[in-house]
Amino acid sequence: MLILFETPGGFAIFKVLNEGKLSNVEDLGNEFSTAKLARKMVKLVAFDKFDNTAEALEAVAKLLEGTPSKGLRKFLKANCVGETLAVADSKLGNIIKEKLKIVCVHNNAVMELLRGIRSQLTELISGLGDQDLGPMSLGLSHSLARYKLKFSSDKVDTMIIQAIGLLDDLDKELNTYAMRVREWFGWHFPELAKIVQDNILYAKAVKLMGNRINAAKLDFSEILADEIEAELKEAAVISMGTEVSDLDLLHIRELCDQVLSLAEYRAQLYDYLKSRMNTIAPNLTALVGELVGARLISHGGSLLNLAKQPGSTVQILGAEKALFRALKTKHATPKYGLIFHASVVGQAAPKNKGKISRSLAAKSVLAIRCDALGDSQDNTMGVENRLKLEARLRTLEGKDLGRLSGSAKGKPKIEVYDKDKKKGSGGLITPAKTYNTAADSLLQTPTVDSENGVKEKKDKKKKKKADDEEEAKTEEPSKKKSNKKKTEAEPETAEEPAKKEKKKKRKHEEEETEMPAKKKEKSEKKKKKKTEV
């Protein structure tokens, strides 16, 4: 029986010298305790060395998929025809058996043999030492990891970080230069700033026109619309601006050239950023767009660092200052950061922006991880998630105000609110009311409805009379009782005014007795004063 063994340097085939010991699997490990015992157990038959790292990577990658490489098939055909081959992978053994017609074996005894060969590998294969095996294993493992992650120079996200930074700087520079052109040329032609709103079109118009006197002779059709051109020419005739020299106009035109060149380079840079984003992060680009995706990568440091972040962090990425201020003051934390500028969040109503940004952040994290570590190079995942988000946005926008969370557990019966509804059916007990056209006629013609109405009124009057008579009967005994109470209370009320009159007389008599005493005291005081004088 032969054994196929894979090493970082190549494929080796060993022959089992003593197959009788394979029956005792537990003691097989003792047969490889020393190099001498190992040489008695197995013997190297053939060795196929890899020429370079690329060949080794290709062979190992095929083995991981469970298929033999082209070199391995040739090697097995040359050395294993008519023999039984022990392999470490049962899937690989099945494919070798189908394609090469070689009987393959995979069991516990084979695994013990492979473990023993690995422990004495440098002794069994001459010319392969530990100093060679270590670097081979390290290089092959790095290459294999790079192959699994599909790492390539196209995936370098440094270009995106630099490009988005330069794009932001260009926007600031363009805005500064354009405002300088408006302020400078505004002294000569101030009305032009209101007529032409776009900065690039303004710079083109100033460069073409120069002095406002030339506006009537020039053709602005390539730059401006017909209506704006006519308005510009009318305003140039009656402008309130001051006159400027040719030297001033020369410098203004040079500044306009700078604005136009910067705008042209910005457009080229944006196209470059677009292509790089579609190459490096296609799923993220499909979800949030090129600019927002590039800013997220730039803020995260790299695409791989961003893939390690959770959805809650990606949601508020760019709003760190507001987050820490809210935590410090114990207020509500922000709901979104850079992700707020995505088109999906912009389409949502203000009350739904928080929900959509949370959903978008969760989907964006999945897209980032797929872009950074996935095998696919297309944007199918991003497009699917964007459609899901748009569907969720439509459901949020169309949801009833009364049912914001979940659905009602129990629905009320219609009979509670509508008494005319039949139980168990949708019909009405009473017939539907129809409009009475006879009520509109001026002639007083008696109708069935009117006669019924008169009868109902008479019945109501009779009922009222009967009710009044009953009330009168009940009120008569109560009146008698009240009259008796009044007669009993009358003598008491008659005695009360007599008592009051007696009290008044006593007070009057007391006041009369006190008055002469007071007069005497006053006269005595006057006499004393006269004597003192």
From Swiss-Prot:
Keyword Ribosomal protein present in the record's keywords: the answer is no
Q: Name one GO biological process term.
A: ribosome biogenesis
Q: What span is annotated as the signal peptide, if there is one?
A: none
Q: Where is the composition biased (Basic and acidic residues)?
A: 412-423, 474-489, 515-524
Residue span, Nop domain: 280-398
List the biased-composition ranges (Polar residues).
Answer: 433-450
Example of a GO cellular component annotation carried by this entry: small-subunit processome
* Any Pfam family matching the protein: Nop
Q: Which InterPro entries match?
A: Nop56/Nop58, NOP58/56_N, Nop_C, Nop_dom, Nop_dom_sf, NOSIC
- Which stretches of sequence are listed as region Disordered? 402-533
Q: Where in the cell is it found?
A: Nucleus, Nucleolus
Q: What's this protein's function? A: Required for 60S ribosomal subunit biogenesis.
Q: What is this protein called?
A: Probable nucleolar protein 5-1
- What is the name of the gene encoding this protein? NOP5-1
